[in-house]
């Protein structure tokens, strides 16, 4: 008897992929950007989900290369004290995604961790390109660290999190915080992060480039919306996988979650290995039978993998924000 290592998709995931195929929706590059964004919103709304109660506050802060950044602050309902904070940077290929499409997921995080969640509505591509969205994410994190009292959070107890393109920017915000002397970040949670450029040529890209939700063609298109100038394709602030080990040293402890059937799987795991090699406390978990976006897509919210991965992320964030002693001494060097 031989062991069969071929991926087996979760039944709900199989159904979801067939549903999308039967729907016959156009590829993201075949429609206008506004139409693509509307398609994503509709895709989330098609699947009603239970949402945890939360306090929600939208505001505009005076930072960033364009002068202002919009944020949404979520807190557990009825909680009035000063809370630690999770800065959340959303995915969607730098093109799609907003606070509305992430509402269910953000409410889960704030209730499970007991932390406030600050969701950054960075200006999306192609209207704004690298490095503007990244700099807006960094500027928002810096503002929250310095002005936490204005939004009733403890800016000295901050973690960052993000998925896909947002996972890219979440970890690069940690790079910038180290390089620029702050803010202090206690942990980073990266969910199926985009860490390389489309030329990386991984095995997972070859194996899952078609038919598994995020295609290699779509990822190439998303990348060029964010980084239109190929001269930036190896810049570590766009491509964190290419960062030298000394740049990774002393970054915050990391949790990286990958999906087995995802074009971005291998680059996320390669980045985890780089972090570990640089001495960063790193946990990387691959969820079998899962596809890209499985934690945030409403249609997959009740799958065993989404439930387990979300619980793992929330437990890590809660511990990091409640136990300062768990942070290695050298990681306070860029306070």
Residue ranges and their predicted role:
Residues 82-92:
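Short beta-strand element of the alpha/beta-hydrolase
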Residues 128-150, 313:
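Alpha/beta-hydrolase active-site loop
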Residues 145-160, 180:
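Gly/Ser-rich "nucleophile elbow"/oxyanion-hole loop immediately N-terminal to the catalytic nucleophile
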Residues 64-65, 71-82, 241-248:
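Short beta-strand-to-loop junctions in surface cap/lid or active-site-entrance loops
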Residues 162, 166, 170:
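Gly/Ala-rich beta-loop-alpha elbow adjacent to hydrolase catalytic centers
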Residues 1-73, 232, 304, 315, ...:
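A glycine/proline-hinged amphipathic helix-loop "lid/cap" segment
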Residues 100-119:
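Short amphipathic alpha-helix adjacent to the substrate-entry channel of hydrolases
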Residues 155-156, 171-335:
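Alpha/beta hydrolase fold serine-hydrolase catalytic domain that processes acyl esters and thioesters
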């Amino acid at each position: 008897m031989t062991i069969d290592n071929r991926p087996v998709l979760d039944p709900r995931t199989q159904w979801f992929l067939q549903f999308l195929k039967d729907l016959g929706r156009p590829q993201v590059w075949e429609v206008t950007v506004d139409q693509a964004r509307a398609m994503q919103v509709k895709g989330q709304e098609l699947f009603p989900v239970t949402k945890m109660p939360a306090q929600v506050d939208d505001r505009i802060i005076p930072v960033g290369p364009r002068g202002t950044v919009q944020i949404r602050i979520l807190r557990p309902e009825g909680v009035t004290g000063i809370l630690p904070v999770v800065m959340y940077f959303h995915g969607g290929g730098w093109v799609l995604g907003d606070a509305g499409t992430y509402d269910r997921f953000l409410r889960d995080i704030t209730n499970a961790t007991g932390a406030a969640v600050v969701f950054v509505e960075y200006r999306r591509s192609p209207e704004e390109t690298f490095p503007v969205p990244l700099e807006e994410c960094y500027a928002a994190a810096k503002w929250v660290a310095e002005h936490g009292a204005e939004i009733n959070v403890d800016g000295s107890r901050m973690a960052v999190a993000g998925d896909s393109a947002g996972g890219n920017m979440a970890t690069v915000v940690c790079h910038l915080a180290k390089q620029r002397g702050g803010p202090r970040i206690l942990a980073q949670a990266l969910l199926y992060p985009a860490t390389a450029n489309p030329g990386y040529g991984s095995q997972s890209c070859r194996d899952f480039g078609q038919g598994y939700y995020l295609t290699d063609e779509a990822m190439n298109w998303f990348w060029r919306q964010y980084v239109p100038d190929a001269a930036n394709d190896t810049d570590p602030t766009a491509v964190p996988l290419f960062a030298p080990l000394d740049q990774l040293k002393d970054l915050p402890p990391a949790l990286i979650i990958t999906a087995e059937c995802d074009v971005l799987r291998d680059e996320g795991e390669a980045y985890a290995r780089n972090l570990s090699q640089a001495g960063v406390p790193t946990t990387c978990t691959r969820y079998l039978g899962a596809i890209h976006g499985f934690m945030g897509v409403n249609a997959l919210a009740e799958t065993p993998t989404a439930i387990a991965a979300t619980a793992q992320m929330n437990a890590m964030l809660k511990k990091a924000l409640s136990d300062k002693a768990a942070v290695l001494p050298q990681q306070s060097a860029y306070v």
